[in-house]
Regions:
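Glycine-rich, N-terminal phosphate-binding loop of Rossmann-like dinucleotide-binding domains
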Residues: 37
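A short acidic Gly-Thr/Ser loop motif
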Residues: 133-134, 200
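Helix-rich effector regions associated with P-loop NTPase G domains
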Residues: 2-32, 40-41, 46-48, 52-62, ...
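Canonical P-loop GTPase G-domain recognition
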Residues: 59-62, 68-132, 145-158, 275, ...
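Conserved lysine of the Walker
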Residues: 137
């Protein structure tokens, strides 16, 4: 079954326009950029707005490919060749499953490698953290915060008795893209000091193609209210069949007929029956079930 005709995909809420200006203002005083991308969509999650700003202000960049546990080693090698060769940026692979200390050490090492040690002993390096919504930016920030607590404290201390302030300013995370608005800078290294300043996740005013838009929707970067789950299933099925990745069939307990025909509607109806859903919302429930399994990596590692 051929993929359904797709409408033009756009998602650029008003707060993102303001956030773009915030990022540019902060970039003037930052010495480096840490860009978080989703490793499953390493090219589609490139934001041309970030590219233009990094070039204009000539800032060194470390690209953190998050959710790297969901892509193969062969794909990681291709990602490194492209990003380091075409975008002149260092690449670091990570996932929320990693130990926070490991991420802190790797990231601070890469930032210092790109910027050099600060000129003054008591100075530090400030890096701006940017990325599209829902690429795991807030999860990484919070993981780094927890790693800093385990490491024996932070710059957020009260004077006198040395008691730590209660940490209430934590980056919110969730399945809703574009949730993060603002969090304070965090320190991820000492001697020399390295600070990260988080920023809101932003999209671009115009997505270059429907293919890119659908890939971003599959990864959860564009919310379901913009691209319904039922619209994603035909696109995902086409990608998996074209890549000869049939792991989804066993994960969803599907008959061979669906693999042979590529019928997305039959796929959703079969899954709905398998998970005990019926009625008018059965296909939607099935589509959400399929997307949840894909995003967890139950269908294998592929881009």
């Amino acid at each position: 079954m051929a993929a359904q005709a797709r409408r033009t995909i756009t998602w650029f809420p008003g707060h993102m326009r303001k956030a773009t200006q915030i990022i540019e203002d902060k970039l003037r005083s930052a010495e480096a950029v840490v860009e978080i991308r989703d490793a499953r969509v390493p090219l589609s999650s490139i934001n041309p707005s970030f590219e233009e700003l990094v070039t204009r202000y000539d800032r060194p960049r470390v690209v953190v490919m998050n959710k790297a546990d969901l892509v193969s080693n062969a794909d990681k090698s291709r990602i490194i060749r492209y990003v380091e060769g075409q975008q002149n940026a260092r690449v670091l692979f990570t996932s929320a499953k990693q130990q926070s200390k490991s991420i802190m050490n790797k990231l601070s090492k890469e930032i210092l490698k790109e910027t050099g040690r600060p000129k003054f002993r008591h100075g530090g390096v400030m890096a701006l953290v940017v990325g599209m919504p829902n690429v795991g930016k807030s999860s990484i920030i919070n993981l780094l915060r927890s790693g800093l607590r385990l490491d024996g404290g932070s710059s957020h201390r009260q004077g006198g008795g040395g008691k730590k302030r209660r940490r209430t300013n934590v980056a919110k995370t969730g399945a809703t893209p574009g949730l993060t608005r603002h969090v304070s800078p965090i320190q991820i290294a000492r001697d020399p000091s390295v600070f990260l300043f988080d920023t809101p996740g932003i999209m671009v005013p115009r997505i270059e193609s429907d293919d890119v838009g659908m890939r971003l929707a599959l990864a959860g970067i564009i919310p379901e209210k913009v691209v319904p789950a039922e619209s994603m299933v035909p696109f995902l099925l086409e990608i998996m069949n074209n890549s000869n990745n049939l792991q989804y069939a066993s994960a969803l307990k599907l008959p061979s007929e669906i693999i042979e025909t590529g019928d997305a509607e039959l796929l959703m109806d079969t899954v709905a029956q398998n998970i005990g859903r019926g009625g008018s919302g059965a296909r939607l429930d099935a589509a959400r079930h399929i997307m949840a399994k894909y995003r967890k990596g139950d269908f294998g590692k592929f881009l």
